[in-house]
A protein has these predicted regions:
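Rossmann-like NAD(P)(H) cofactor-binding subdomain of soluble oxidoreductases
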Residues: 1-44
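Conserved aromatic-histidine-acidic binding/catalytic patches
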Residues: 4-8, 123-131, 190-192
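Alpha-helical scaffold segments in soluble metabolic enzymes
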Residues: 15, 19, 73, 138-141
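Substrate/ligand-engaging "lid" and interaction regions
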Residues: 38-131, 135
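A hydrophobic C-terminal alpha-helical subdomain
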Residues: 106-120, 169-192
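Small-residue-rich helix-loop
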Residues: 125-128, 134-176, 188
């Protein structure tokens, strides 16, 4: 039995499931995805190493098929692993689309000018945070319309780390794991 696991799925598992479930020539397969990455990491300057900057305490995932191997693997990565009901639930629970896209759009001139900046530092202004909160309200409304109970962005971020924060701004600016994250250097970067 084989498994395919999409980290920070964002609908990747659903696309793979739709494509592969129609095929008759593949062995039994489990397809899963996580709502978010289990760690914060960056590639070294020379591309030879992955630098782990922080490991999250909780990972949410969904899977189609026998998920025992997927669950066991994720339990090796994080102390808390939560299975959600569907790919829609994990994809809509992803924090990166709300955080990364919003902050990148608000800082697009820095990115186009190839400025070297820390993504979760000065760019997280009150206006950026307010816009993220509005985007999060929309995300929660979409989930509700689909019958999916989603957790607010701050609650999700607080589930990742031992130190809980009272505001989204605190959660993004004061987390030591986020401090070393550099901003994108191109509008071709994955945050877009």
């Amino acid at each position: 039995h084989q498994s395919i696991l999409f980290f920070n799925g964002c609908w990747g598992a659903l696309k793979a499931y739709r494509a592969l479930s129609k095929r008759q020539d593949i062995p039994p397969l489990t397809i899963g995805e996580t709502a978010n990455m289990p760690f914060i990491a960056a590639l070294s300057q020379d591309g030879s190493e992955i630098l782990i900057k922080g490991i999250k305490e909780e990972i949410a995932y969904s899977a189609a098929g026998d998920d025992k191997a997927v669950s066991a693997f994720l339990h090796r990565l994080a102390p808390r692993v939560v299975k959600t009901a569907s790919f829609a639930s994990t994809s809509l629970s992803a924090t990166n689309p709300v955080i990364h896209v919003t902050a990148s759009l608000f800082n697009v001139t820095r990115i186009e000018n190839k400025e070297d900046f820390y993504f979760f530092g000065d760019p997280m202004t009150d206006r950026v945070i307010s816009f993220m909160e509005h985007c999060d309200e929309e995300r929660l409304a979409v989930g509700k319309a689909l019958g999916i109970r989603l957790s607010p962005l701050l609650e999700v971020l607080n589930s990742f780390w031992p130190e809980k924060k009272n505001t989204l701004k605190e959660a993004l600016k004061e987390n030591p794991s986020y401090r070393a994250v550099k901003g994108p250097s191109s509008t071709e970067y994955r945050y877009f």
